[in-house]
Amino acid sequence: MLFHTRIAAAIAALSVSTLALAAGPAVVKGPGENPGCFKPWTDQTKYFQWPAKKGPYRIALANGFVGNTWRIQMIKMAKAYAATPEMKGNIKEFKIVSTGTDVAAQIASIDNFINSGYDAIITIAVNPTAFAPVIKRANAAGVVLVPFDNVLDSEEVMQVNEDQTGLGTAYGEWMIKHLPKKTGKLLEVRGLPGNSVDRDRHVGFRKVVEAPGNKFEIVEVVGNWDDGTAQKVVADAVAVHKKFDGMIVQGGSTGAVRALIDAKHPMIPVAGESENGFRKLCAERAKDGLICNSLGQSPGLVAISMKAAVAALQGKVMPQLISVPIPQTQHPNFKAGVNYF
């Protein structure tokens, strides 16, 4: 009888353990691990804790779009960070796949990593709303899923990002500062359609420039965060509209400015991303009237996401949404060897 009781107790304990794992992380009280690195988004951000696993871990990066310099730099940074002494001892295997802009293909790649027994998957989501089922599948398998950059419209998963709406707001506020009459024609060069970063920056920018009292005419084009595409669509916009008073570029800022130069368009205020080539042009063309604000998404988000995934696997208390500061440099502070190379 005692034997059967012990067996029943063991089965019950195993069932509870499995259920807890299947339910995903527990919601716990903060503060979390290393708040200097893993800063909670607000004081209302909740905290997660996963059951601790023994390392080293199998970690995957499920990337989507790979067609611009930012993504290429991000992937190189991920590989480099995985090889650092800090991470090398914690990682048994690190694999990267890029599936393009197809939502189903990216979800399938995440499912494949889950089914293959990976411990954590970091991802730049192609779509912010389509991932609820795969979050449940990751939780059921005890896999830590960490979206970053293009994050999800969900509070059920740990995420890492900069404030994209705030970044769009900063674009708009800076532009109005340099166009004090609050009127004129603005060119808005958007990013990759369907992504949360593109959506949130657009919303933040429009909220400022379309506020009561402003009388801007806004021409919107899609540059896909890519220099070549941005250069073409800006050239086409200049050919049609002839003159703009200001331009904001979510990505591909170097190409966008080159289009203005090639068209012999007067230099105007440009709020763009943090690409090195853009900053170099801002410094070189300042004498011609090019006034720039360079702020944007750091490819270093991938390293923070990898570090967060490992901390979560170790059972550390983690914020559900981790806030990363926005790097920014603006005219006249562009300096070779300091903030561009």
Model-flagged regions — what are they?
Residues 111, 115, 119-140, 205, ...:
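Hydrophobic alpha-helical
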Residues 1-56, 114-115, 136-143:
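Short, low-complexity disordered leader/linker segments with a strong preference
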Residues 84-99, 185-188, 209-228:
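Short beta-strand elements in bilobed, periplasmic/extracellular small-molecule ligand-binding domains
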Residues 37-46, 106, 160-186, 200, ...:
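Hydrophobic alpha-helical segments within soluble ligand-binding/sensing domains
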Residues 59-63, 67, 78-79, 171-220, ...:
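An alpha-beta-alpha
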Residues 24-57, 209, 297-341:
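Hinge/cleft segment of the Venus flytrap/periplasmic-binding protein
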Residues 128-166, 276-288:
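Flexible loop/hinge segments that line or gate small-molecule binding clefts
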Residues 31-52, 56-77, 81, 85, ...:
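Extracytoplasmic "Venus flytrap"
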